[in-house]
């Protein structure tokens, strides 16, 4: 009998042992999925999801480069299977024999449907004595229709929605999000929450062993992990003995460590750094990521002066995007404004090339036109303003923007904050008065369509611009009601155009970023290397991909490491 050939055979036979070391750009401030602000949690390394990616899927079919994974390419993880008895009911059947890590107070007990109910009740205050939803989920329109979560038996979970449909339910519950990582109820009941890293307990392949803020996090293999490799069903996971994170805000320092073989993965670097390291270390693999950090200047749309569309247009006209593309990015980025949906989501947006000339003119450098708009809005002599900036963002670019605004007599004071402080001040506290600036803005998304359509929804957690526009709010129910992909694409395209015309944010550029990995890191194809930590999967996929990647020991040794 002829041996069956699989596409992954070319990746080599998996090997056990060794360690994967990952560079983390910002400090880790969160160990509890209830507190999602800032996406600086890594709890996806030991907590798991109900549904995950299809590890056996041929990359020629779907390459996981986008943050959005269509439901047809998802498979059960903690869940074994699911069904939809009607349009608004989703029934999950859990795998049997999954156990929590053997740590107190869980002590290795079995994972059951009651644990899933606890997670969703806690996150969305649906019952079980929880009256306050997660700060980040409270305003998430996608879950407004979630009526209840129940467990009719030990391995069955029933979700009841009000007006959604099977496709939107799959996207809402199971698409990539930190909110889907299951925390241990016993730990929450004992300590109130699991924010302290010492209380980290999951069902995943790695156990958090050590953490020093601003320095590192170390995870070790869970000896009692339930999972096996879907490609090699006889292989128990994980392959590596240790998963380590080195917290390195400075990209130059991270590049140096990568060049010296001390880091296996850098999730994201700029084009300039990718070009530089290709010259010094051509053996290091470079994976173009979907889009890149969508830097934007984000005004509060609910307060003067930025509640006036003319003022927001003026700021856009004051900025010379082609010059920034040429001189700041060295010509390594397209000189066009970012749009709500990244160009990488082909067919899902409203790319600049399709804009009518009148709209293009609103994004074309024109300081004289900007001054006229300011005068028409009642600011003939400009005004003073301030911006709360995340210190981990591109501060050189911020100074360039400040200079452009000064040319139209807008004096912008910069208030720098470290990422945790920025999150507390802006994302949680909403204490910013006028402008905010951060590396990862609300444009250029490759996320799920229903996630994109909520970006500027009234009251949504990530709506730092405080936009409240009934026209934009109306896109969400239309998206949920879409009965086919073409209808949904049309809604997303219209939303893109509306955002561009309303100038909710000052659009800048979307540089191409790259993930870097050492050649001895094996198991996945290129896009999946990026998938582990950023882009298509992010922190919630750490346990999934981290368990399935392995180190080619002979290759690493032959390269002197």
Regions found by a protein language model. Give the residues of each.
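N-terminal lobe/hinge region of extracytoplasmic solute-binding protein
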Residues: 2-8, 20-86, 201
């Amino acid at each position: 009998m002829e041996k069956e050939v699989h596409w992954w055979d070319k990746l080599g036979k998996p090997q056990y042992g060794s360690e994967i070391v990952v560079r983390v750009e910002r400090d880790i401030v969160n160990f509890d999925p209830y507190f999602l602000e800032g996406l600086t949690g890594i709890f996806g390394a030991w907590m798991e999801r109900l549904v995950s990616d299809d590890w056996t899927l041929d990359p020629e079919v779907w390459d996981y480069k986008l943050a959005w994974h269509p439901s047809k390419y998802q498979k059960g993880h903690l869940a074994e299977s699911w069904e939809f008895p009607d349009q608004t009911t989703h029934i999950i059947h859990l795998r049997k024999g999954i156990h929590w890590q053997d740590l107190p107070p869980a002590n290795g007990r079995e994972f059951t449907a009651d644990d899933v109910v606890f997670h969703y009740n806690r996150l969305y205050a649906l019952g079980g004595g929880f009256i306050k939803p997660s700060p980040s989920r409270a305003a998430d329109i996608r879950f407004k229709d979630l009526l209840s979560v129940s467990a009719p038996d030990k391995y069955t979970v029933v979700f009841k929605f009000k007006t959604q449909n099977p496709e939107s339910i799959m996207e809402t519950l199971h698409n990539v999000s930190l909110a889907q990582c299951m925390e241990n109820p016993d730990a929450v009941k004992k300590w109130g929450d699991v924010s302290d890293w010492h209380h980290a307990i999951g069902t995943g392949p790695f156990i958090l062993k050590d953490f020093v803020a601003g320095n590192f996090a170390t995870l070790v293999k869970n000896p009692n992990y339930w999972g096996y490799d879907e490609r090699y069903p006889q292989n128990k996971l994980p392959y590596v003995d240790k998963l380590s994170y080195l917290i390195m805000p400075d990209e130059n320092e991270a590049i140096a460590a990568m060049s010296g073989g001390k880091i296996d993965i850098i999730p994201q670097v700029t084009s300039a750094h990718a070009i530089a390291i290709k010259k010094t270390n051509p053996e290091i693999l470079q994976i173009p990521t979907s889009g890149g950090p969508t830097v934007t200047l984000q005004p509060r749309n609910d307060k003067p002066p930025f509640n006036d569309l003319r003022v927001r247009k003026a700021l856009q006209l004051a900025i010379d995007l082609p010059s920034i593309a040429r001189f700041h990015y060295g010509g390594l980025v397209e000189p066009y404004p970012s749009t709500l949906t990244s160009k990488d989501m082909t067919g899902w947006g409203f790319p600049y090339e399709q804009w009518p000339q009148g709209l293009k003119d609103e994004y074309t450098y024109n300081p004289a036109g900007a001054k006229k708009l300011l005068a028409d809005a009642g600011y003939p002599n400009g005004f003073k303003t301030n911006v709360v900036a995340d210190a981990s963002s591109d501060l050189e670019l911020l100074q360039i923007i400040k200079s452009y605004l000064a040319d139209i007599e807008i004096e912008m004071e910069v208030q720098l904050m470290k990422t945790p402080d920025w999150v507390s001040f802006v994302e949680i506290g909403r204490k910013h008065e006028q402008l905010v600036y951060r590396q990862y803005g609300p444009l250029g998304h490759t996320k799920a369509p229903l996630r994109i359509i909520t970006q500027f929804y009234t009251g949504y957690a990530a709506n730092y611009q405080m936009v409240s526009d009934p026209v934009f709010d109306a896109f969400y129910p239309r998206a949920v009601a879409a009965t086919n992909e073409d209808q949904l694409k049309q809604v997303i395209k219209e939303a893109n155009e509306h955002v561009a015309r309303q100038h909710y944010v000052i659009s800048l550029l979307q540089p191409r970023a790259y993930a870097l990995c050492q050649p001895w890191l094996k198991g996945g194809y290129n896009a999946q290397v990026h998938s582990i930590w950023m882009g298509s999967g992010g922190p919630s996929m750490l346990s999934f991909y981290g368990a399935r990647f392995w180190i080619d020991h002979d290759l690493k040794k032959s390269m002197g490491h």
